[in-house]
Amino acid sequence: MGSCYSRKNKVSTISLDEEEKKKEKKKKKKIYILNGASGSGKDTQCRLLEKKYNYKIICISKLLKEYKEEYNKENVLNEEENYFDEIEKCMIDGSLVNDQIVIEIFHKQLNKYINDDKYNGIIINGFPRNYEQALLIIQNNISITKFINIQVGKDTLWTRINNRIIDPITNISYNENIIQIIKKKREGQELSDKEQKQLIIDNHLYNNLSNDILERLTKRKDDEEQVFNKRFQLYIESEQKINSLFKNICKNVDGEKSINDIFDQICSIIDDNPN
């Protein structure tokens, strides 16, 4: 009888230890913000980081759609009922969702992923976008591990955007010059040493592209210089205010370098903050 009691007690202790480990893991889950202007390569870096670290990538536009799909007016709190109409309206007319609503939904969905053992950490892609959103993050006591800022000059940003084409189905962007090199190679044409080197550098991003994907790639309608200039100016004005709130945890990355070099810089920041 004493032996049975001891075995049960042992199982109970193990169970408690496992629960404590789970709680500790959730408490230690790192949250990084990846900041940068349009064309700085945030999406590309997020895909690479997601694969290496098994992190959940949070993008606000996708988060709002996800929230709308997961919930309905019957299963949310009363104060959230008007969120659906607001999100629906903004999705239709292209306007911005109210900052307070964005933060409320962001906080709710963020907690879901913090408590999900499937992910080792979280990377927030390109959010907050303005000072008000950044301030709300601080006021809601959302603990950010590091604010990683990809710094790229205006001329480089415009060159990248001008050479950017996207997959309209996945919304993944690619470099048009590299796509042309891939097409040239598949057509059996001889590549220059420079073109061969470019394919080797970016092979991990482009080697699985099917011919169907290559054919449907297209330019974004808003990738025009006038639109870019306006967005860049707004970004610069917001960045200075946002960075002031995260100055103690801000780490700058040289975004003028290659994709792999930028990735190594970001990985170094993450690896300096182990769980």
From Swiss-Prot:
Residues 59-97 are annotated as: NMP. A lipid is attached at G2 (N-myristoyl glycine). Its EC number is 2.7.4.3. It is an enzyme of class 2 (transferase). This is Adenylate kinase 2. It comes from Plasmodium falciparum (isolate 3D7). SUPFAM superfamilies: P-loop containing nucleoside triphosphate hydrolases (SSF52540). One of its GO terms (cellular component) is symbiont-containing vacuole membrane. Optimum pH is 8. Residues 165-214 are annotated as: LID. Keywords: ATP-binding, Kinase, Lipoprotein, Membrane, Myristate, Nucleotide-binding, Palmitate, Transferase. Coiled coil: none annotated. It comes from the Eukaryota. ATP binds at G39, S40, G41, K42, D43, T44, R164. Belongs to the adenylate kinase family. Myristoylation is required for cell membrane localization. May be palmitoylated at Cys-4 which stabilizes cell membrane localization of the myristoylated protein. The gene is AK2. It is a lipid-anchor. InterPro entries: Adenylat/UMP-CMP_kin, P-loop_NTPase. Changing N125D: 36% decrease in catalytic activity. Catalyzes the reversible transfer of the terminal phosphate group between ATP and AMP. Has very low activity with CTP, GTP, ITP and UTP and no activity with GMP, UMP or IMP in vitro. Gene3D superfamilies: P-loop containing nucleotide triphosphate hydrolases (3.40.50.300). It is found in: Parasitophorous vacuole membrane. Monomer. Oligomer. Heterodimer composed of NMT and AK2; AK2 myristoylation stabilizes the complex. Pfam families: ADK (PF00406). GO terms for molecular function: adenylate kinase activity; ATP binding.
